[in-house]
């Protein structure tokens, strides 16, 4: 059999999440037959604006908005059945066909009520020292996976095995809850009854996702792998311990979807024209003045899932350089360029001073990053609006110069520029699937 040629693209956030991946995945989905989520859980919200209507997706890939596109939730995702089914119902109420176009890996780790209880109790106990989790049980579920005590989607359809595994894992978590965290225990019967009640609705969507993705590749179908969070929140390469609990880098698409690394041919890095961060953790280019407030206000910088305000700062090119290296980024997509409209001057981070020495790439670990002082370069701003522009040549001259300097500092070309929330408000310099 001669294998047909397909092209597969990985979309990755290059900062601390919230870069605008959802819109770009939705836009790129016109060129694919499958969209795959490969890590994270329902802690990450992807916001889409379609013809002026706002849609927030937490678990379901953004390709669901396109007829004829099959969406996959890969094994690297930690899955709350309750959250998934609620999201499906919301989309169906809006008139979308979801269940016939969604496949869920049978080996996804389940998020169950005791994970949420542990997550919330830990954050409450830490007080001011908390990481800033969403309290949705993501971290504790990944802990169970690594400790080899997790319940998985396939266990929902073997009640005897489910009960056996639940008794073991709940014995551990209830000990932690009551003896260490000072919280109430979780009832095994309640966990079981809830899970078994949800299982029949989930069953028709449960598949061997890895095999089905392989089959699509053999047929020459294009695939899009949709990352959640951002590379600087990666559990290994991010500002540890102020990170998420999964690997957010492009390489995680292979393990988290069950495809070979040779299937990942192009990596698109999504980055804002400035920088934001939610929750705790070091942030070298953060602005705590009126400009930071202005960026947050104009950029509507509030979390799509939690509603938490985002911290804002100048674009950090040295942090992006780390992301470019980690992900093997082929090209960048710059989002929210319009938020910088009207600024007289714009600062761009090109490196750091660490113990008196210049560093041109983000150090590893939160302690080292906290010691780093951003080295900023000043560029002229622009007064003209960039909103809705779809041709690069029509951008203000200084906006083009800013983008060119960003590409130079990061060492990778800019292939796309998003000039508004709607999928059509996009400048294409090189199309990831067609270029």
Curated annotation (Swiss-Prot):
Major location category of this protein: cytoplasm
The protein's name: Adenylosuccinate synthetase
Function: Plays an important role in the de novo pathway of purine nucleotide biosynthesis. Catalyzes the first committed step in the biosynthesis of AMP from IMP.
Keywords: Cytoplasm, GTP-binding, Ligase, Magnesium, Metal-binding, Nucleotide-binding, Purine biosynthesis
Textual note on the cofactor: Binds 1 Mg(2+) ion per subunit.
Cofactor: Mg(2+)
Residue numbers binding Mg(2+): 18, 45
Subunit note: Homodimer.
Residues given in the record as substrate binding sites: 304-310
UniProt superkingdom: Bacteria
Coiled-coil features, chain-numbered ranges: none
The gene coding this protein: purA
InterPro entries, alphabetized: Adenylosuccin_syn_GTP-bd (IPR018220), Adenylosuccin_syn_Lys_AS (IPR033128), Adenylosuccinate_synth_dom1 (IPR042109), Adenylosuccinate_synth_dom2 (IPR042110), Adenylosuccinate_synth_dom3 (IPR042111), Adenylosuccinate_synthetase (IPR001114), P-loop_NTPase (IPR027417)
Entries under NCBIfam families matching the protein: PRK01117.1, purA
Source taxonomy: Bacteria, Pseudomonadati, Pseudomonadota, Betaproteobacteria, Burkholderiales
Gene Ontology molecular-function annotations: adenylosuccinate synthase activity; GTP binding; magnesium ion binding
């Amino acid at each position: 059999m001669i294998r047909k040629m397909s092209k597969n693209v990985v979309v990755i956030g290059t900062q601390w999440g919230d870069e605008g991946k959802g819109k770009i995945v939705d836009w790129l989905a016109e060129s694919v037959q499958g969209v795959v989520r490969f890590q994270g859980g329902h802690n990450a919200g992807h916001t889409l604006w379609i013809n002026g209507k706002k849609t927030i997706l937490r678990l379901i890939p953004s390709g669901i908005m396109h007829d004829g596109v099959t969406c996959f939730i890969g094994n690297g995702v930690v899955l709350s059945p309750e959250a998934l089914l609620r999201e499906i119902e919301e989309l169906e109420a809006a008139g979308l066909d979801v269940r016939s176009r969604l496949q869920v890996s049978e080996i996804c780790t389940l998020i169950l009520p005791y994970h949420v209880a542990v997550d919330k109790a830990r954050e409450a106990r830490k007080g001011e020292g908390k990481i800033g989790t969403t309290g949705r049980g993501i971290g504790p579920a990944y802990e169970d996976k690594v400790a080899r005590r997790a319940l998985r989607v396939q266990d929902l359809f073997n009640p005897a095995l489910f009960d056996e595994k639940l008794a073991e894992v709940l014995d551990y978590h209830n000990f932690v809850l009551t003896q260490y965290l000072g919280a109430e225990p979780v009832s095994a019967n309640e966990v079981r009854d809830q899970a078994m009640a949800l299982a029949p609705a989930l069953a028709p969507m449960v598949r061997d996702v890895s095999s089905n993705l392989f089959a699509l590749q053999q047929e020459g179908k294009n695939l899009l792998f949709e990352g959640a969070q951002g590379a600087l929140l990666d559990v290994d390469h991010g500002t540890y311990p102020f990170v998420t609990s999964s690997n957010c880098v492009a390489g995680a698409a292979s393990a988290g979807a069950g495809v070979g690394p040779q299937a990942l041919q192009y990596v698109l890095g999504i980055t804002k024209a400035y920088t934001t961060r939610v929750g705790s953790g070091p942030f070298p280019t953060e602005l705590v003045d009126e400009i930071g407030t202005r960026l947050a206000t104009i950029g509507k910088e509030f979390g799509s899932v939690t509603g938490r305000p985002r911290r804002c700062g100048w674009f950090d090119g040295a942090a992006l350089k780390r992301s470019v290296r980690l992900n093997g980024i082929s090209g960048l997509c710059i989002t929210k360029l319009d938020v910088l409209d009207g600024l007289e001057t714009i600062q761009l981070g090109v490196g750091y001073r660490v113990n008196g020495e210049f560093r041109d790439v983000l150090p590893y670990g939160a302690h080292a990053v906290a010691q780093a002082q951003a080295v900023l370069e000043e560029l002229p701003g622009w007064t003209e609006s960039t909103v809705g522009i779809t041709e690069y040549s029509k951008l203000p001259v200084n906006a083009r110069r800013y983008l060119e300097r960003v590409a130079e500092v990061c060492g990778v070309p800019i292939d796309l520029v998003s000039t508004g929330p709607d999928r059509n408000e996009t400048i294409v310099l090189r199309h990831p699937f067609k270029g």
